[in-house]
Structures are given as C-alpha cells and as structure tokens.
Design a protein with these regions (language model features):
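A short alpha-helical cap/connector motif
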Residues: 1-176, 180-240
Length: 240
C-alpha cells in the first residue's frame, strides 16, 4: 500500500511541476479556477453550488466502478479507459442532479457510459444519454435497459456532423468530454457544450491538462470551474 501511495504521489508531483503531455501544468490550469481538489468527496463538500446529495452516492459509485472495470468487455485499447474519480464524479452527479439529457463524447470501452447509464436507470426522470464516437465497435460498450443513443461520427467530417446531431437534441443538462484531447477539438467542443447546455448545466472534461483549451475557456466563458486530481491526469468541472 505504501509503495502504491508513493507512486501516486510522484505522478501528481510531476503534474504539479511539469504538466502532462504538452506541458500544461497545474499552475496554468489553476488560474481563475474556483477550487482544486484531491477527490470527488472533498469537491462536493466544499462547493455550495454542487448538490450535497451527491455525497450519498460516492461509496456506491466506487463499488460500481470496481464491478464495471472487471466485467466490461474490451472493444478498444485499455489505455483509453476512464479512471475511478471520473467514474465516481459522473455517477454521483447524475444521481443527484436527475438530468434529462446527457451528452458524452468518447465511448471507448464504455466505463463512463456505464457510470452515466446505471445512474440514469435508477433516476425518476429516466433521462437519456447521447454518446458520440468515431469507432463503430464502441456501439457495443453498453448493454442495458436504459435510454442510450449511440451516434457514430465520420472521422472525416466530425465537426459538421456533431453540430448537426446536437442541434436536433433538447438543451443539455450535463456534457462529458473524453474524446479528442487536442487543442483544436477541445476548444471547439467546449464552445459547443456552452451553447448547448441549459443555464446551470455542467461541463465535465477529462484530460484538461492535454491542451491549453480548458485553461483559456473555463475562466472566460463559464461561471465557475473546478479541478479534481485523478491518478494520471486532471478532470475539469465547469458551471454555465
């Protein structure tokens, strides 16, 4: 256990000092953010604009993550799998907020898809999830009774296609980005989410340290934003 904790500390220290991939460090990301947290529990308890009832679902989410991770069928590379904090955040917020419409970009092996769908299945509103990916095999990432809508994007015409698909949908309550983490796509998607979200809606982004897009847009276009550590990267949460 001690060696495991030490390894996590070293990874997080490296993120503090150097950033990840293209060198987007925590110092750059933190400018203008409303708070930086080690996990979902401390975030929810500290921030008044996030639903306190989400804390009631954290243990449930963590147990479910272990189950989903073991049982989930591999359809793409495992390195694209979401990690525990993102899974927990999504499950807890979807349970607490009872959203009607959720958008997810990037399905991979369906870890986040299952977090959202298993929460929606239990909610009174029986909300719907619209998931977008360029890989046809990811359409098999979720099998269940909930209202899941998979949208296959053409990799040669992704920008135009996703805009066309989104404009057909109602306003969005929660938007989850976990697809292309390059600067151009992240900036495009964050702005599309901003336009599509209801007032008070939530944008959640994995890998905000992959480009400078989050640092630029979260402070200038959203009302509040927060950062959570995951074991290898940062998660961003922004409120419209």
């Amino acid at each position: 256990m001690r060696d495991s904790l030490l390894a996590i500390f070293k990874k997080r220290l490296n993120l503090f000092l150097k950033g990840d991939r293209d060198g987007v460090s925590l110092g750059s990301l933190s400018t203008g953010t409303s708070g930086i947290y080690l996990n979902v529990d401390t975030l929810i308890k500290a921030e008044s604009e996030l639903p306190k009832t989400a804390c009631n679902f954290i243990n449930e989410a963590e147990n479910l993550f272990e189950s989903v991770s073991i049982k989930q069928q591999q359809v793409t590379n495992l390195r694209w799998n979401a990690e525990k904090q993102l899974f927990t955040l999504l499950y807890a917020l979807v349970k607490a907020n009872n959203p009607k419409v959720v958008i997810e970009t990037g399905v991979a092996n369906g870890i986040t898809t299952n977090a959202i769908m298993k929460a929606l299945e239990l909610n009174e509103s029986k909300g719907e999830l619209h998931s977008f990916d360029v890989l046809p095999e990811t359409s098999k990432a979720y099998i269940g009774s909930g209202n899941w809508n998979f949208h296959l994007l053409n990799s040669k015409n992704t920008y135009k296609q996703i805009v066309n698909e989104i404009t057909k949908l109602p306003k969005v309550d929660i938007w989850v980005h976990d697809s292309d983490h390059g600067y151009r796509w992240q900036k495009f998607e964050y702005l599309l989410a901003l336009k599509s979200l209801n007032t008070g809606g939530i944008l959640i982004s994995d890998d905000i340290d992959a480009s400078s897009a989050w640092a630029e847009l979260s402070r200038s276009h959203f009302r509040k934003s927060y950062i959570i550590f995951d074991s290898r990267k940062f998660i961003g949460i922004a409120l419209k």
